[in-house]
UniProtKB/Swiss-Prot annotation:
The gene is infB. It comes from Bordetella parapertussis (strain 12822 / ATCC BAA-587 / NCTC 13253). This is Translation initiation factor IF-2. Residues 96-377 are annotated as: Disordered. Its main location: cytoplasm. Residues 504-508 are annotated as: G2.
């Protein structure tokens, strides 16, 4: 369309024709009406006038970018918490736009002024929803009152070519009297832009002359009328963009200064707005944001905001209106959700989640925002610390302890590492360690009372009360080794047990019952060797009376004293049998004196302990001994119920190859029958067979009767309590519970011991002798392991890798191969396959039947592992009689051997006035001209010292050697 008249040119520029006519007249073009023709020269004059009014081209945009990095912790699919690095990049562009472009929820200022008069009329302009494909970016402003640049151009000038669409300066209002209003507009726009996730927040300030004030441009005006209003001006050859930039008359310098100040104030307000989003985020309530829109520069407070107009009236195709609606809704949703989900607490807001540029373009920003909001909710799940009461059982794994405290197992492991204990997640902790960890986490630790199935046993015992009847006494024979305990019992039993025992010493605890003329007596024979302390303690625990056997020719020995202590600890009365009185060297009076020193006072001295002189060889005094024992039993009035389920004590236990686990039981109360379900420690079973001490089958056994039973699931520990239960299922449950409890406690103790030994042996060259011990009975295993472990020293440590009852099997040899151990068999032998495997792999198998033989050989092996001792031995003394200095050789000493011998490989010590001057080696030794290996006393020789030429007449050389001597334990 050709712009031939003023009206057509005004239509092309989309501005009122009368405004354009006024600007043409101000440019010096003589036109009378809007129907007059406009030439190219007229357009050039108008363009030149507008350029003079505005000055040089200024930047049209401010681009602000921000990049923030934060960390969030989020659980993955496996439940593990992972730290994720989140980088948020946001960009915001402030653009000076044309008045014809859509305004983003902001009122535009349209003011116009005459070339000389500064007053400005104001009216909010409605945003026009222009099609996106319309190629008319260079649309002129409606009017320019003063040449005032926007704060965006002041803050960051970006000169661009004139034809560019964004190069047209946004015409700001040049109001010398009201610069603060522009600042108010910017602040209002900033308040609107903060909660909205919009990348391009564009500011628009337009101007208009007083003439169009009468035009209807109120907020109620529709966008269509606003769009059709400036459409009646013909095109000319001059570029519309240039005409638009020059569409205002020149202004005085004073007005430019005022405009510059206003622009600086607006730029300061913009900077303040950029630094304000963090404060906005801390206030989740949306009320302050709504209040910021209540009173603006162009509208009094209380009226509906102009931002609502684009949401309702703008075309759906207008991108500005659509984006404004979406972002406003999303922003309000976030604000409401934040206010609803996040109560007011003292935690600071996380500024990396939301912000003045929080959103993105299109759907991406919303999706990212939702994910960030979920992360925020995930963080809120972590609650404050709550102190709990933690019930800690005897043993507990690290994982279970962490679960009880509601923390991760890794935190418990870290805490244990701080306490100096290296553990894994499945490792079992003892109760003491677990309680320390619980207290370290700030909880209260309580020793738990487990759901113990053994409580059932107490209930059973309470129910089975019955009338007690007299029972036979249980007598334990104690004393030092070789004092004649077993021989005394042999005479009483009319049997020969001692002659059949290895080495003539008792190594098992034996139980027998003997029928005498005055009644039945049950005897327990205990070992006297020092290794069997635990066995003697068990014997004293199970007994009613103790016979203390003391040899009349030997007196009180260490194990005699130990037996006295066991008897006193158990509160058991003593009867002293002074044995071997038939020997010529017997001295019973000395024995009495020594026992009085141990607080065992005989009756004849005013005490309460009967002393009976006996001889196991001739039988003298045996009847008096039994009479005293039965007298003590009558005083004690021993009774026990008979018609109740049996209870007893495991005296000894072993693994028999043909019969399985065999236990020697002393029945203490009730009656034990064949077929009863029994529980002994961690083993249970049904009694399949019962044998007396002579090996005969019996069906029942009453109180104080020792029997051997078969049918247990495994070998019980000596000293365990045995009881009969009515329910086999209950017996199995209790046995399994005890097994797990014992295993857990053992593992926890082992771990603590390993840690202690690891720190003790750190940096030391400690040798370790590994042993695997297999014995015939449980008591021997216990005694042997205890004796061998006591042999450990600072340099050599005995480590019992495995100890069990039974023969040496192939699995034992395999364990010895893996641990490089020596296998010790005590009264047992190896299987044929185990022998072959041991020979093939060079494993040392040792068999013993006397306990102190095993102890002595292990001690000898440990001695061989000790580092040899180095000793210095002086072998000769040499005196220097002459000193020669020879070139290329050094100082040669002519010497006389005064004592001993001098060897060429010996070490020497140089003495001067009996003070050591030097210690080293001989370099050469000669007699006359010949090299010799040694020179004996009384002969002279010549010698040189290695590395020392300081020799004088009268010096002495002490010749010595270092010898290694094997050490013993």
């Amino acid at each position: 369309m050709s712009s031939n008249t003023v009206a057509q040119f005004a239509t092309e520029l989309k501005m009122p024709a009368n405004v354009l006519l006024e600007q043409l007249r101000a440019a010096g073009v003589d036109l009378k009406s809007v129907d007059d023709a406009v030439t190219d020269s007229d357009k050039a004059k108008l363009l030149e006038s507008l350029r003079r009014a505005h000055g040089a081209t200024e930047g049209k945009k401010i681009t602000l970018t921000r990049r923030q990095t934060s960390e969030i912790r989020q659980a993955d699919a496996t439940g593990r918490s992972r730290t994720i690095q989140v980088e948020v990049r946001k960009k915001r562009v402030f653009v000076k736009r044309d008045p014809a472009e859509p305004v983003r929820a902001e009122p535009a200022v349209e003011t116009a002024a005459k070339p000389v008069e500064p007053p400005v009329a104001e009216a909010p302009a409605e945003p026009v929803a222009a099609p996106a494909a319309e190629p008319q970016p260079e649309q002129p402003a409606q009017a320019e009152a003063q040449p005032e640049p926007t704060p965006a151009a002041q803050a960051e000038p970006e000169p661009q070519p004139e034809p560019q669409p964004e190069a047209a300066p946004a015409q700001a209002v040049a109001e010398p009297v009201e610069p603060a209003k522009n600042v108010s507009v910017t602040e209002t726009e900033a308040e609107q832009a903060r909660p909205e996730p919009v990348v391009h927040a564009q500011t628009e300030l337009t101007s208009q002359t007083p003439a169009p004030v009468a035009q209807p441009s109120a907020p109620a005006e529709s966008p269509k009328s606003a769009k059709a209003e400036p459409a009646a001006a013909p095109k000319t050859t001059a570029k519309p963009g240039e005409i638009r930039r020059a569409a205002a008359p020149a202004a005085p310098d004073r007005a430019r200064e005022e405009a510059r100040r206003a622009a600086e104030a607006e730029a300061a307000a913009l900077r303040e707005m950029l630094s304000r989003p963090r404060k906005v985020l801390r206030a989740p309530e949306p009320e302050p944001q709504a209040g910021a829109l209540s009173g603006t520069l162009h509208k009094p407070a209380g009226k509906p905001a102009t931002t609502a107009a684009p949401k309702k009236d703008a075309k759906p195709g207008a991108p500005g209106a659509k984006k404004t609606i979406k972002t406003a809704e999303v922003s309000s949703t976030w604000s409401d959700d934040s206010a609803r989900k996040k109560p007011a607490d003292n935690k600071p807001a996380v500024t990396t989640r939301d912000g003045w540029r929080a959103g993105g373009k299109g759907g991406r920003g919303g999706r990212n925002s939702r994910n960030q909001h979920q992360d925020r909710r995930h963080e809120q799940v972590q609650q404050e610390f709550i102190a709990r009461e933690i019930h800690v059982p005897e043993t507990i794994s690290v994982a279970d302890l962490a679960h009880k405290m509601s923390v991760k197992a890794a935190e418990v492991i870290k805490q244990l590492m701080k306490l100096g204990q290296m553990v894994t997640i499945n490792q079992v902790l003892d109760q003491e360690t677990a309680m320390i960890v619980v207290q370290e986490f700030g909880h209260t630790a309580i020793a738990a009372k487990l759901d113990d199935p053994e409580a059932f046993l107490d209930e059973t015992a309470a129910v089975t009360e019955a009338e007690a009847e007299p029972r036979a006494p249980v007598v334990t024979v104690m004393g030092h080794v070789d004092h004649g305990k077993t021989s005394l019992l042999d005479y009483i039993r009319r049997a020969k047990v001692a002659s059949g025992e290895a080495g003539g010493i008792t190594q098992h605890i034996g139980a027998y019952h003997v029928e005498t003329g005055r009644g039945v007596v049950t005897f327990l024979d205990t070992p006297g060797h020092e290794a069997f302390t635990a066995m003697r303690a068990r014997g004293a625990k199970a007994t009613d009376i103790v016979i203390l056997v003391v040899a009349a020719d030997d007196g009180v020995m260490p194990q005699t004293r130990e037996a006295i202590h066991h008897a006193k600890a158990g509160g058991v009365p003593l009867v002293v049998a002074v044995n071997k009185i038939d020997k010529p060297e017997a001295n019973p009076e000395r024995v009495k004196q020594e026992l009085v020193a141990e607080e065992v006072v005989p009756e004849e001295y005013g005490g309460d302990v009967p002393f009976v002189p006996v001889s196991a060889k001739t039988g003298a005094g045996i009847d008096d001994l039994l009479e005293n024992v039965l007298l003590q039993a009558e005083i004690l009035e021993l009774k026990a119920p008979i018609e109740v389920p049996a209870k007893g004590l495991v005296i000894e236990a072993r693994l028999d190859k043909g019969r399985g686990p065999v236990a020697t039981i002393l029945v203490q109360s009730g009656t034990l029958k064949r077929g009863d379900v029994v529980l002994a420690g961690a083993s249970f079973g049904r009694v399949r067979a019962m044998l007396d001490e002579n090996g005969k089958q019996i069906q029942t056994a009453g109180p104080s009767i020792p029997v051997e039973i078969q049918g247990l699931t495994e070998v019980p520990a000596a000293g365990d309590e045995l009881m009969v239960l009515s329910d086999e299922r209950k017996a199995r449950e209790i046995a399994l519970f005890r097994q797990g409890k014992f295993r857990d406690v053992k593992l926890a103790r082992q771990q603590a011991a390993k840690l202690e030994s690891m720190f003790d042996n750190l940096g030391e060259g400690t040798q370790t002798l590994a042993l695997i011990v297999k014995t015939d009975v449980q008591g021997s295993q216990e005694a042997l392991v205890s004796s061998l472990t006591k042999l450990s020293t600072d340099e050599v440590r005995v480590q019992v890798v495995h100890a069990a009852v039974g023969g040496i099997s192939e699995s034992d040899v395999n364990l010895a191969i893996a641990s490089n151990a020596v296998v010790i068999g005590f009264n047992v032998r190896a299987e044929q396959s185990a022998k072959k495997l041991a020979e093939t792999n060079g494993i040392d198998l040792r068999y013993y039947n006397i306990i102190y033989d095993a102890v002595d050989e292990v001690k000898a092996a440990m001695s061989g592992m000790l580092a040899p001792e180095k000793r210095e031995e002086v072998i000769g003394l040499v005196e220097v009689r002459e000193v020669y200095t020879i070139s290329r050789i050094g100082t040669v000493a002519g010497c006389m051997v005064l004592d001993g011998v001098v060897r060429r490989d010996s070490q020497v010590r140089l003495l001067r006035n009996n003070v050591v001057q030097w210690t080293g080696h001989l370099d050469s030794l000669r007699r006359f001209k010949d090299d010799v290996k040694e020179v004996k006393s009384g002969f002279d020789c010549g010698l040189t010292l290695r590395g020392n030429n300081d020799l004088q007449l009268g010096d002495q050389l002490e010749v010595f050697e270092i010898k290694e001597i094997a050490r013993t334990l």
